[in-house]
C-alpha cells in the first residue's frame, strides 16, 4: 500500500453527474447540428430556388429544349 | 462370546450405515459447475465465493486473526486477505490490451484477400459490361440530359454553362 493517504473518491451521484454532463453535451451538439443544417443546407437551397425562378422564362427554356431535339411530340 | 457376536452385528450395521452415508454423500454432493463460480466482473463486484477455495495453514491462521480487531493486521496481511477473496483488482481486470491491433490487422488482411478474389472474378468469371457503359454512349447520354435540363437548380444542369458550352468552373 502507498505510504500517503489517497483522497476519498466520489461515492455517490455518479450516474446523475454522468447524465447531467451528457445532457449538456447532447443539447449543445444538437443545437449546433440543427443550426449548421439550417444555414448551410436549408437556407442555401431556398436561395438557389428563389434565384432560379426570379427571372425564369419558361417559353425560352422550352424553345431551347425543342431546338436540341429531345421532344417526340414537337420538333 | 454372545456379546462379541452381538457387537459384531451392531458393528456391521454401523459400518454398513456409515458406508451408505458416505456413498450417499458422493452422490448428493453438488458438482463444481452447479455452484456459484468466482468471476472478475465490473458489474458483479462481490462474487458469492472467494477466489481461494482451499486455504493453506498460514492462510487459515490469517483468517482466524481476521476475526479479531482489524487494526492489529499489518498492511501485508490486509493485502493477503484481499488476494484470498479476490483474484484481480478492479484496476487489473480493467486494464487495456493490444488486442485491437490484432483485430484491425486481421480484418484488413481479409478485406485485402477479398479484393484479390474479386479481381480474379472480374478477369475470369464476369462477362463484358453492357454498351451503355462505353465512353461515347455516356457522353451522348450526358449531352441529352443537359439538353433536357435535368435538375437545373442544384443538380446536373446547374453545373453546365449554357453560354460557353462547357462545365462551370
Swiss-Prot record, chain A:
Pathway: Energy metabolism; oxidative phosphorylation. The keyword Transmembrane helix applies. GO terms for biological process: oxidative phosphorylation. The keyword DNA damage does not apply. It is found in: Mitochondrion inner membrane. InterPro entries: Cytochrome_c_oxidase_VIc, Cytochrome_c_oxidase_VIc/VIIs, Cytochrome_c_oxidase_VIc_sf. It is a single-pass membrane protein. Keywords: Membrane, Mitochondrion, Mitochondrion inner membrane, Transmembrane, Transmembrane helix. Residues 1-13 are mitochondrial matrix. Component of the cytochrome c oxidase (complex IV, CIV), a multisubunit enzyme composed of 14 subunits. The complex is composed of a catalytic core of 3 subunits MT-CO1, MT-CO2 and MT-CO3, encoded in the mitochondrial DNA, and 11 supernumerary subunits COX4I, COX5A, COX5B, COX6A, COX6B, COX6C, COX7A, COX7B, COX7C, COX8 and NDUFA4, which are encoded in the nuclear genome. This is Cytochrome c oxidase subunit 6C. It comes from Pongo pygmaeus.
Amino acid at each position: 500500500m502507498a505510504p500517503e493517504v489517497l483522497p476519498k473518491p466520489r461515492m455517490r451521484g455518479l450516474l446523475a453527474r454522468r447524465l447531467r454532463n451528457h445532457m449538456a453535451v447532447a443539447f449543445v451538439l444538437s443545437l449546433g447540428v440543427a443550426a449548421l443544417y439550417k444555414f448551410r443546407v436549408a437556407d442555401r437551397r431556398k436561395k438557389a430556388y428563389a434565384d432560379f425562378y426570379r427571372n425564369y422564362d419558361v417559353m425560352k427554356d422550352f424553345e431551347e429544349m425543342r431546338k436540341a431535339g429531345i421532344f417526340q411530340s414537337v420538333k | 462370546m454372545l456379546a462379541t457376536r452381538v457387537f459384531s452385528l451392531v458393528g456391521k450395521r454401523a459400518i454398513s450405515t456409515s458406508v451408505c452415508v458416505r456413498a450417499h454423500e458422493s452422490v448428493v454432493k453438488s458438482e463444481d459447475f452447479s455452484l456459484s463460480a468466482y468471476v472478475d466482473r465490473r458489474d458483479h463486484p462481490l462474487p458469492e465465493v472467494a477466489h481461494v477455495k482451499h486455504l493453506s495453514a498460514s492462510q487459515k491462521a490469517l483468517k482466524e486473526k481476521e476475526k479479531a480487531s482489524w487494526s492489529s493486521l499489518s498492511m501485508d496481511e490486509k493485502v493477503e486477505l484481499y488476494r484470498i477473496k479476490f483474484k484481480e483488482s478492479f484496476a487489473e481486470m480493467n486494464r487495456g490490451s493490444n488486442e485491437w491491433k490484432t483485430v484491425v490487422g486481421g480484418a484488413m488482411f481479409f478485406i485485402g484477400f477479398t479484393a484479390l478474389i474479386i479481381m480474379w472474378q472480374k478477369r475470369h468469371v464476369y462477362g463484358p459490361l453492357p454498351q451503355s457503359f462505353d465512353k461515347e454512349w455516356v457522353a451522348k447520354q450526358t449531352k441529352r440530359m443537359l439538353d433536357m435540363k435535368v435538375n437545373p437548380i442544384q443538380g446536373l444542369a446547374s453545373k453546365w454553362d449554357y453560354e460557353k458550352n462547357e462545365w462551370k468552373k
